[in-house]
Amino acid sequence: MVALSVVELLKEKIRQEGRVISDDVLKVDSFLNHQIDPVLMLKVGEEFARRFAGSAITKVLTVEASGIAVALMTGLSLKVPVVFAKKKQPSTMDGETYCGRVRSFTKEEVIDIVVAGSYLGPEDRVLIIDDFLASGEAARGLLKIITQAGATLVGVGTVIEKVFQTGGEALRDQGIRVESLVQIGSLAGGQIEFLN
């Protein structure tokens, strides 16, 4: 029996456990962003490490909370630290900070994300990792933080890209390398259309 690739494993998991909420929203909270399948997430992290091998990555960056599991497994596979942007600056975060503004598609709110200056710097080569890529808001907010830190963006890795929401296209048009494990072309009529 041939082992399925991580992409095929993800697609199968989405088919079995994913739920289309609307033409724009896919619910995958049973394995990705509420309850987490750690074995699958480790395979996802290993796949991102494979795809970005040779990029001299020094940090993996994500936004709390849904991206943390994927980012952690990617950092583990790359053997580099993981930094997550906080959605609220804690009172314990002092010194220089880097901030970005993000509009959450599913929560319909605008939030300011923040990273302590001591965790990102000009010497860093950063890989952004997240669970979903839709409008690209989270990636753009994290890119602002990377720019403020004087660090270098290596690329963006996302588990699921909703291609019909054009965030990935906009990032690619800026010359940013985007690696999406699963690309979805449509959720219309409650049907998941995979592009890869």
Curated annotation (Swiss-Prot):
Which CDD domains does the record associate with it? PRTases_typeI (cd06223)
Q: What InterPro entries does the record tag this protein with?
A: PRibTrfase_dom, PRTase-like, Pur/Pyrimidine_PRTase, Xanthine_PRibTrfase
Q: Which GO terms describe its cellular component?
A: cytoplasm
State if Glycosyltransferase is listed as a keyword.
yes
Biological process terms in GO annotation: purine ribonucleoside salvage; xanthine metabolic process; XMP salvage
Kindly tell me the pathway this chain contributes to: Purine metabolism; XMP biosynthesis via salvage pathway; XMP from xanthine: step 1/1
Asked if Glycoprotein is a keyword of the record, the answer is no
- Annotated GO MF terms: xanthine phosphoribosyltransferase activity
Quick one: which residues bind 5-phospho-alpha-D-ribose 1-diphosphate? Answer: 134-138
Task: Supply the EC number(s).
Answer: 2.4.2.22
Q: Describe the subunit structure.
A: Homodimer.
Name the protein family: Belongs to the purine/pyrimidine phosphoribosyltransferase family. Xpt subfamily.
Described purpose of this protein according to its UniProt entry: Converts the preformed base xanthine, a product of nucleic acid breakdown, to xanthosine 5'-monophosphate (XMP), so it can be reused for RNA or DNA synthesis.
Q: What is this protein called?
A: Xanthine phosphoribosyltransferase
Q: Which organism is it from?
A: Moorella thermoacetica (strain ATCC 39073 / JCM 9320)
